[in-house]
Curated annotation (Swiss-Prot):
It comes from Schizosaccharomyces pombe (strain 972 / ATCC 24843) (Fission yeast). It is found in: Cytoplasm; Nucleus. Its EC number is 3.5.4.-. This is Uncharacterized deaminase C1683.02. Belongs to the metallo-dependent hydrolases superfamily. Adenosine and AMP deaminases family. Adenine deaminase type 2 subfamily. Substrate binds at D279. Keywords: Cytoplasm, Hydrolase, Metal-binding, Nucleus, Zinc. Binds 1 zinc ion per subunit. The record marks H223 as: Important for catalytic activity. Its main location: cytoplasm. InterPro entries: A_deaminase_dom, ADE, Ado/ade_deaminase, Metal_Hydrolase. The keyword Disulfide bond does not apply. GO terms for cellular component: cytosol; nucleus.
Length: 339
């Protein structure tokens, strides 16, 4: 391990872009298949790992949704969330905001209550066991209707105190953010924080970024590297101090060899970049430390810049000022020890 890799490993981190359904590693997938008596096309962990290959967003979602079918019971959601938080804590993640997609489950007849109770229990147990604080962000699925998103928002209300924000994810094609404008407006009125995926090199991505910022008024952009294609959008993001939850390895899959240098351009432009792992189980188990290492090499990040990226994450987190100051003080103490 190099000095910079050791530095990255020990950095106190926050993760703001992580899909819980995207943390279904091969071992747990096989376990759930046996537990729930749902046969897989694969018969071994090695074969499952081999199946985690894709070349674009559509082929990724096909594999992703296959894994979702195995999640049936509260304990399944508990195991999924607890496993991620244990792994994150081992990589010095002290705070995490975790996306979950209830529509992927309710459309299969799984109740919202089953999903959320498993996640809440895992969140609380992980805090007790690993001292990692985490919160949940509920995402709407772009391919599904506005009406279904509205129903999902209504279903979330009994658990509003357990959900910090609302996001939008999945396939962008023909599913712009503006499609969900009214449900986002209502979510804001209810007190939810707002974010939105604007994925790398998808059709009309810069239009989607503009809609997310100007029409919906999100507080963060998930991915969002294509903002570099529009100087006016860059100006708007800088004026509003919009954080970008960038995911180096998933970007590398979509845009090989070029995604990491664009992180360098974003930083040099003054944009508020954070580094995250997205769907690590489906991306060669590149969790946050591996994503930091990839970005560091590809964007030639210094230790000072790595600390600033971590600082960006804590500043962008949807937490109390008391917690934010606590995390920033710990980060500053860590950085000072390396000066």
């Amino acid at each position: 391990m190099t000095d910079i890799e050791r530095f990255i490993e020990k950095l106190p981190k926050a993760e703001l872009h992580l899909h819980l359904e995207g943390t279904l590693e091969a071992e747990l997938k096989l376990k759930l298949s046996h537990r729930n008596k749902i046969p897989l096309k694969q018969s071994s962990i090695e074969e499952i790992k081999e199946s985690y290959n894709f070349h674009d967003l559509a082929s990724f979602l096909e594999v992703y949704y296959e894994g979702v079918e195995l999640l049936l019971h509260e304990q399944d959601f508990y195991d999924l969330c607890y496993q991620y938080l244990r792994k994150a804590a081992s990589q010095n993640v002290v705070y995490a905001e975790m996306f979950f997609d209830p529509q992927l489950h309710t459309r299969r007849g799984i109740s919202f209550e089953t999903v959320i109770k498993g996640l809440i229990r895992a969140r609380d147990d992980a805090m007790r066991d690993f001292h990692i604080y985490s919160q949940l962000i509920m995402c709407f699925i772009r391919e599904m209707s506005f009406e279904n998103a509205e129903e999902t928002l209504n279903a979330s209300l009994p658990y509003k105190s357990e959900i910090i924000g609302i996001g939008l994810d999945s396939n962008e094609e023909n599913n712009p953010p503006i499609k969900f404008l009214k449900v986002f407006q209502r979510a804001r009125q209810l007190g939810y924080r707002l974010t939105c995926h604007c994925d790398l090199h998808q059709k009309n991505t810069t239009t989607h970024i503009r809609q997310a910022l100007e029409d919906i008024g999100v507080e963060r952009i998930d991915h969002g590297i294509n903002i570099l294609d529009d100087p006016e959008l860059i100006k708007l993001a800088l004026e509003r101090n919009i954080p970008f939850t960038v995911c180096p390895f998933s970007n590398e899959i979509v845009y090989p060899g070029k995604a990491q240098p664009e992180i360098r351009i974003m930083l040099d432009t003054g944009l508020k970049v954070t580094i995250n792992s997205d769907d690590p189980a489906y991306m060669h188990c590149f969790y946050i430390t591996e994503n930091f290492n990839l970005a560091q090499k590809g964007a030639s990040l210094t230790k000072k810049e790595l600390v600033q990226i971590c600082r960006n994450s804590f500043e962008a987190a949807w937490i109390s000022e008391e917690k934010r100051n606590h995390y920033l003080e710990a980060l500053n103490s860590f950085a000072s020890a390396y000066d």
